[in-house]
């Protein structure tokens, strides 16, 4: 346990000290290229808990965006395997290896069947004008043709994006229920840039709905921790307030464990959940915001789970397990 916390602390210092992400990416790319030389036979085989993180990132199926499966701000992966990624996710807990493996294998199967796994949200010109936008985009888990969509943003304190634990598994579950789910890879460094990326993601889906095969009616925004702040801000003020186009605000916002307190009288219906032992997002504070929305006549649902801390994701094996089914049901009530 002490070793794990020491590793996490070192990881966090590395993350917080990042001032030049592009240089860092170049360093990581060199490491990954070496890994590719060592693991030549990585094509479309399935992964398991012993598969190296670098091997997954370099799989041809992921076409260069495999780095976004894991916190890409990390400057090292070494011999890290899929059953030992906790050090990459210092703000997260209860990381379930079986879920990690299922997510990656599902993406490999989708690639094998010809599905597009990742979409850019910025044009090449926009990326040239602001090179930080290179590190953005969305994974896509396709549901039923013409079904509503959700965009999920993982947390990480705006220092890293914990998608492998806090948004990719959620998207997989939503797609199993027939819904189209996008996982946002946003820029780290602060809420403003992250919200701009979410606004652009919403605009991208609306503008390409026919190509993507999704309905823009009754969409939802999901997020955990920092990602929940993003979902809440876009729910309160809409994409135009953050540089996107004037598209509707979501039909529902699904939030996990955040101390976000801002709200408006026009907020969408909001589902929220948190652990009672959360030392980052106090559950009483989260409840205060939900009760304020209640008083405004906004439909809400709030759950707090015993013996549970911050960053539990799907909460597999915890008192929160199954919360996502409640959240889906809440969203479904507000789709029309």
Across the structure, where does each feature detected by a protein language model lie?
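C-terminal catalytic histidine-bearing segment of alpha/beta-hydrolase fold enzymes
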Residues: 22-26, 31-66, 296-336
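N-terminal cap/lid segment of alpha/beta-hydrolase-fold proteins
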Residues: 60, 66-145, 191, 195, ...
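Short beta-strand element of the alpha/beta-hydrolase
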Residues: 147-156, 271
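Catalytic nucleophile-loop/oxyanion-hole region of alpha/beta-hydrolase
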Residues: 162-164, 183-212, 316-320
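Short amphipathic alpha-helix adjacent to the substrate-entry channel of hydrolases
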Residues: 163-182, 291
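Primarily recognizes the serine-hydrolase "nucleophile elbow" in alpha/beta-hydrolase
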Residues: 200-267
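Short alpha-helix in the alpha/beta-hydrolase fold that links the catalytic acid
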Residues: 268, 282-292
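Short beta-strand/loop motif that positions the catalytic acidic residue
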Residues: 272-274, 278
């Amino acid at each position: 346990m002490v070793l794990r916390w020491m590793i996490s602390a070192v990881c966090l210092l590395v993350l917080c000290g990042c001032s030049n992400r592009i240089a860092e990416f170049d360093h990581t790319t060199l490491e990954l290229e070496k890994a590719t030389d060592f693991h030549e036979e990585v094509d479309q085989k399935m992964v398991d808990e012993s598969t190296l993180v670098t091997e997954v990132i370099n799989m041809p199926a992921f076409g260069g965006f495999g780095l976004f499966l894991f916190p890409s701000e990390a400057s090292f992966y070494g011999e890290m395997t899929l059953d030992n990624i906790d050090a990459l996710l210092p703000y997260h807990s209860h990381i379930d290896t079986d879920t990690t493996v299922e997510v990656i294998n599902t993406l490999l199967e989708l690639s094998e069947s010809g599905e597009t796994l990742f979409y850019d949200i910025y044009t090449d010109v926009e990326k040239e004008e602001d090179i930080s936008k290179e590190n953005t985009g969305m994974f896509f888990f396709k549901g039923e043709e013409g079904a509503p969509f959700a965009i999920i943003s993982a947390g990480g304190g705006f220092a890293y994006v914990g998608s492998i634990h806090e948004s990719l598994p959620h998207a997989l579950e939503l797609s199993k229920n027939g819904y189209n789910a996008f996982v946002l890879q946003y820029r780290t460094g602060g809420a403003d840039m992250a919200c701009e990326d979410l606004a652009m993601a919403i605009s991208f889906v609306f503008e390409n709905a026919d190509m993507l095969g999704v309905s823009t009616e009754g969409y939802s925004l999901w997020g955990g921790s920092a990602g929940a702040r993003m979902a809440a801000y876009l729910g309160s003020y809409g994409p135009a307030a953050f540089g996107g186009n004037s598209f509707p605000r979501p039909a529902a916002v699904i939030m996990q464990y955040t101390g976000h307190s801002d709200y408006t009288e026009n907020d969408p219906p909001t589902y929220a959940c948190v652990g009672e032992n959360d030392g980052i997002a106090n559950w009483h504070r989260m409840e205060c915001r939900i009760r304020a929305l209640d008083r405004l006549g906004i439909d809400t649902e709030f759950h707090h789970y015993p013996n549970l801390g911050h960053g539990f994701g799907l909460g597999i094996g915890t008192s929160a397990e199954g919360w996502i089914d409640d959240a889906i049901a809440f969203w479904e009530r507000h789709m029309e």
